[in-house]
Amino acid sequence: MKKVTMLGAGSWGTALALVLTDNGNEVCVWAHRADLIHQINELHENKDYLPNVKLSTSIKGTTDMKEAVSDADVIIVAVPTKAIREVLRQAVPFITKKAVFVHVSKGIEPDSLLRISEIMEIELPSDVRKDIVVLSGPSHAEEVGLRHPTTVTASSKSMRAAEEVQDLFINHNFRVYTNPDIIGVEIGGALKNIIALAAGITDGLGYGDNAKAALITRGLAEIARLGTKMGGNPLTFSGLTGVGDLIVTCTSVHSRNWRAGNLLGKGYKLEDVLEEMGMVVEGVRTTKAAYQLSKKYDVKMPITEALHQVLFNGQKVETAVESLMARGKTHEMEDLVNTFENQVK
């Protein structure tokens, strides 16, 4: 039996640990909070992040990083993007053999503009990692914890590693596909949080279904524009980690990013929203990173730019919506039309 370690005991890490134990694995969950580990080991629950879900006794918690990662065959990183470097640096000295690393977070590092797998390639020496795999898709932890049907994608530069992770997680409640396009998978997973924030804002403003449908559709267009420019496969954005993740994150009350946007739409200040949420809202940091990427790659991302104005420059949400609706007219399939015209020339 493989030793599987989960770095992070938030809602998603806990839900995935449950999937793994349903498949007959023992999982060691690491967290820095002793009270959280006590809940997992003694009460077999995680009231803080995944309430009302009974955890398997095969999930063992620890605050000791050496105990967690020593001799691990698979190490799953389930911490927010901003904590990944620090957690990996804590783990590396205690890793005793090459492991497959799986990350399940969705974000881009501001300033460096690195995807999470790129951060991991930098922080993990070649003598401790076999491969890096991303597990992503439309998957709320609350529903996974209740064993509702869920489908995700495992992506890696190594299809062997992606298939290994597919086999580790797949069961009758949790279906896993593979996809070699790690760039597209990571970009889709990260940037959908931006559109979810914007969708929450339109709902908070009471704008209704028409506005949300337009936002999701045009949001997908700018995600695909940037992702393709960065080297992703355009088809990936029509899959689970593109349109699939976008739909679930923009329409569900489980979505932290949607809930945060909803409060912004109702007039709350950003700092008050983040305090009210009490958990990481990845879309805020990702908006800053995506805005920087749009400039770097010279890609039009009007929704991202409008949200950036709201979050970081104090623009009113109503003004941001008005600016989007007042943009100059263009063709819906502008990129395709331009490509076709260039080919004709």
Curated annotation (Swiss-Prot):
GO terms for biological process: carbohydrate metabolic process; glycerol-3-phosphate biosynthetic process; glycerol-3-phosphate catabolic process; glycerol-3-phosphate metabolic process; glycerophospholipid metabolic process; phospholipid biosynthetic process. It is found in: Cytoplasm. Pathway: Membrane lipid metabolism; glycerophospholipid metabolism. Does not seem to be inhibited by sn-glycerol 3-phosphate, in contrast to the E.coli homolog enzyme which is very sensitive to allosteric inhibition by G3P. It catalyses: sn-glycerol 3-phosphate + NAD(+) = dihydroxyacetone phosphate + NADH + H(+); sn-glycerol 3-phosphate + NADP(+) = dihydroxyacetone phosphate + NADPH + H(+). Sn-glycerol 3-phosphate binds at K106, G137, S139, K192, D245, S255, R256, N257. GO terms for molecular function: glycerol-3-phosphate dehydrogenase [NAD(P)+] activity; NAD binding. The active site is at K192 (proton acceptor). Pfam families: NAD_Gly3P_dh_C, NAD_Gly3P_dh_N. This is Glycerol-3-phosphate dehydrogenase [NAD(P)+]. It comes from Bacillus subtilis (strain 168). The gene is gpsA.
